[in-house]
Amino acid sequence: MELLRTVSDTKRTFYALHTRPINTIYRRVVEELMVEMHLLSVNVDFSYNPIYALGVVTTFDRFMEGYQPERDKESIFSAICQAVEQEPQRYRQDAERLQAVAQSLPVNDLVAWLSQANHLQQDADLQAQLQAIANNSNFKYSRLFAIGLFTLLEQSNPDLVKDEKQRTEALKSIAAGLHLSDDKFSKDLELYRSNLDKMTQALAVMADMLTADRKKREQRQQQASTPVAPPNE
């Protein structure tokens, strides 16, 4: 019998693949995403789908905004995926494909499609997966899947997701069509949006602190380089 990989195994693999240090404010983001993906990957009811992939990519890209050095971001993402024995290119490609579909559709058509009220021809593979999800009583729902659905709405019509009434109605329709818990779905997305706001605020505070620190250093350097006039005799 094959032993299931543990969270420790996954973390060990990640840090073997990405050996550069990770900035403190982002380390928690990276580890929480990695642990969430790990726990799903070892769940017997979980199966990969493009909407989940979009949720993973969106979560990483949004919460890693502003990360320095910028060139390390793709290495970190790649290491996360490989640590849970997944292909990072597959996640990126599926995410890009779904975003392109969402951007090409009026939001009402997208909601009807996601809620299985209508069948559209833009992506036969996604259509088949949506039907399979709706018909699978053991479908393993996840927060990352919810974020993927939310991202599709956001890509189709950014104004809709900012309007509480329209957003709530769209999410209820999608949850009903895919047989998801509306309460769980809504709460997960509220938490996601709240955490994004907190991360934005934390980054703004950090940027202000770095600016203030730089100004202090510049002042000290200026004072050190200013010649002191000799005292008058």
Curated annotation (Swiss-Prot):
Keywords associated with the record:
Coiled coil
Q: Name one GO cellular component term.
A: plasma membrane-derived thylakoid photosystem II
Region of interest (Disordered), ranges: 212-233
The keyword Repeat is annotated on this UniProt entry:
no
Q: Which domain of life is it from?
A: Bacteria
GO biological process, alphabetically ordered: photosystem II assembly
Name a Pfam family for this protein: ThylakoidFormat
InterPro entries for this protein:
Thf1
Which residues fall in a coiled-coil region? 183-204
What this protein is reported to do is described as: May be involved in photosynthetic membrane biogenesis.
Q: Describe the family membership recorded for this protein in Swiss-Prot or TrEMBL.
A: Belongs to the THF1 family.
Record NCBIfam families: PS_II_psb29
What protein is this chain from? Protein Thf1
Instruction: Provide the species name.
Output: Nostoc sp. (strain PCC 7120 / SAG 25.82 / UTEX 2576)
The gene is thf1
